[in-house]
Regions:
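Amphipathic alpha-helical segments of tetratricopeptide repeats
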Residues: 14-21, 51-61, 90-101, 131-142, ...
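Helix-turn-helix DNA-binding segment
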Residues: 389, 398, 464-518, 522-535
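Linker/hinge segments immediately adjacent to helix-turn-helix/homeobox DNA-binding domains
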Residues: 373, 385, 389, 393-395, ...
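TPR-repeat structural position
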Residues: 6-10, 43, 63, 83, ...
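Repeat-based scaffolding regions
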Residues: 1-73, 89, 97, 380, ...
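Alpha-helical adaptor scaffolds
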Residues: 348-351, 357, 364-401
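Tandem amphipathic alpha-helical repeat scaffolds
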Residues: 2-3, 28-41, 67-83, 105-122, ...
Length: 535
């Protein structure tokens, strides 16, 4: 096994061996043909060819080689969802390994045992054979087995709650990829598994670093689009977060086409990410199509589809989808956090701050259970939104400044600008027109550069609001003043705005102070004179 630099192209191997009569193909030829079919993105044919290679090796009593052919057939069938067939191959491997305890092949079989236990939902049971595979790979000086088994052990530990230890093992596996001459099968395997794990944990700093390495490796692939397509989806998502939407558009178009053409099982995530980019740009029809295609390909379209409904003013539809979807309760931390953040936004838009507060509690639990700056930033942003809706501006500003600091450290311009929008609104409510304008103009500039049309329109609308002379009154104070002018008592105003009578009294006092009047009647007269009342 070795790197790809001196390897004959897979298409040439396939052409050369396919041209021969079947009875002239050796067992080794069948191995090479099966491998070529894998790299040419033909998994079903590859699985069948590994079966033929296994039989050829067994006919020659080449038990070690037969075990490895069975190992490849096992994973091919496992990946395409044929678990019953995969189970049969595992049984054959067990029989062969029983005759060669401690052999290198037995180590590969142990890794297959770990994978089988893991897909069966028992990560703890998978640890034992995985550690056996690590030990065998080290003892037999096989870097491929050692690196893949270490990476698998890291993922298992993360799933079992030992995140720091698991991440350390993932980093160790990646160093093997970068520093040792691994077979490309194992390089691509480790890259894809590691990137998926880091993304799921919302460890975006680590994901960014390893994604760059993965894409450099993908650039060396002359053939085989599955590994490159999967890695490219991760790169596109990071490009979206870091504000390079032009590169993201180019990358996701290519990823969708490549994955759909060669292995649709992996194309669902690509179409979902495409939907996210379209939604953020305000290309709502294209976003809808992408989310629906993702769903057809087996990817839950939430929370993106719910956020699309929310952007269209359909809060009830968004709430129904998010409350019913399992993404708020299950799956990797990043999926749950994003879904709960969407639920918070939908509850607020739907006029249910109490429910939004409850969703915040669930989001905080996800954040507390995971060390992630990105999750903490999402939590702080949502917390600021909820506090603003609860008319607790000082606490809201504190939370939003925390969110902005974290998003800034992560290099996420759109998220920074979204926080700026809310800070600008809070500034408007407090009568800090200059401060509000600074926030809103900065946010607007970012949205214009990115091409985030919906957020740009919101910024323009809010900036128009700062231009109107509201005499220093906040939105809530204007609402209270309008009701005072209609003759409502503090208790009646409190009931209508769903706030306490004490809060109403505080607003009335602030109104009198800002307008320079001493009575409710004088405030009413001032409001009529200066056009501060609703039509």
């Amino acid at each position: 096994m070795g790197g790809m630099a001196t390897r004959e192209p897979w298409s040439e191997i396939h052409r050369r061996l396919s041209a021969r009569d079947e009875d002239r193909l050796s067992a080794t030829d069948l191995d090479a043909l099966a491998d070529a079919l894998f790299w040419l993105d033909r998994p079903l044919e590859s699985a069948e060819m590994w079966h033929r290679a296994y039989l050829a090796h067994m006919e020659r009593d080449e038990r070690a080689e037969a075990t490895m052919a069975a190992w490849r057939a096992f994973y091919e069938h496992l990946q395409i969802g044929e678990r019953a067939v995969a189970s049969g191959w595992l049984a054959r491997m067990r029989d062969l390994a029983a005759d060669a305890p401690g052999s290198l092949e037995a180590g590969y079989v142990a890794l297959a045992e770990a994978s089988w236990a893991h897909v069966g939902g028992d990560a703890e049971m998978a640890l034992g054979p995985c550690r056996e595979a690590v030990a065998t790979g080290s003892e037999r000086d096989d870097p491929n087995l050692t690196a893949l088994a270490i990476e698998t052990q890291g993922r298992l530990l993360i799933e079992l709650g030992e995140v720091a230890q698991g991440l350390g093992l993932l980093d160790a596996a990646m160093l093997s990829v970068l520093g040792e001459d691994l077979d490309p099968l194992f390089e691509g395997w480790i890259y894809c598994e590691l990137l998926s794990t880091c993304r799921g944990l919302a460890d975006l700093e680590r994901a960014s670093e390893w994604t760059r390495a993965a894409m450099r490796w993908c650039d060396t692939l002359a053939e085989g689009r599955v590994y490159a397509g999967i890695c490219r989806v991760h790169q596109v998502e990071l490009d979206c977060l870091h504000g390079d939407w032009s590169r993201a558009e180019e990358g996701i178009t290519r990823a969708c086409a490549d994955l759909l053409a060669v292995d649709p099982r992996y194309a669902g995530e690509a179409h979902y990410v495409a939907g996210e980019l379209h939604r953020l740009r305000g290309e709502y029809d294209a976003a809808e199509s992408a989310y629906r295609r993702a769903h057809e390909l087996g990817r839950d379209p939430q929370p993106g589809l719910a956020l699309l409904r929310l952007a269209g003013g359909q809060a009830a539809s968004a709430l129904a989808a998010l409350r019913e979807s399992s993404v708020c309760r299950e799956g990797p931390p990043i999926h749950r956090a994003r879904s709960l953040a969407a639920l918070v936004a939908a509850e607020l838009q739907g006029g249910s701050p109490e429910r939004a507060h409850a969703a915040m509690g669930s989001l905080s639990q996800v954040t507390d259970d995971n060390e992630s700056s990105y999750l903490r930033a999402i939590e702080a942003h949502c917390q600021g939104s909820v506090l603003a809706a609860e008319d607790r501006p000082e606490e809201a500003v504190t939370a939003l400044r925390t969110a902005r600091r974290l998003f800034t450290e992560l290099g996420m311009p759109r998220e920074i600008a979204e926080v700026g929008l809310l800070l600008g609104q809070l500034g408007q409510r407090a009568g800090d027109i200059d401060g509000a304008r600074l926030e809103l103009e900065a946010a607007r500039a970012t949205f214009a550069r990115l091409g985030a049309a919906p957020s740009l329109a919101t910024a323009d609308l809010l900036l128009a609001g700062t231009a109107a002379d509201r005499h220093g009154l906040s939105e809530r104070e204007l609402e209270v003043l309008d009701l005072v002018a209609r003759g409502r008592t503090d208790r009646e105003i409190a009931a209508e705005l769903v706030i306490s009578a004490h809060t109403v009294a505080r607003h009335v006092s602030n109104i009198r102070t800002k307008l320079g009047v001493s009575t409710r009647a004088a405030a009413t007269g001032y409001a009529y004179t200066h056009g501060l009342l609703h039509d």
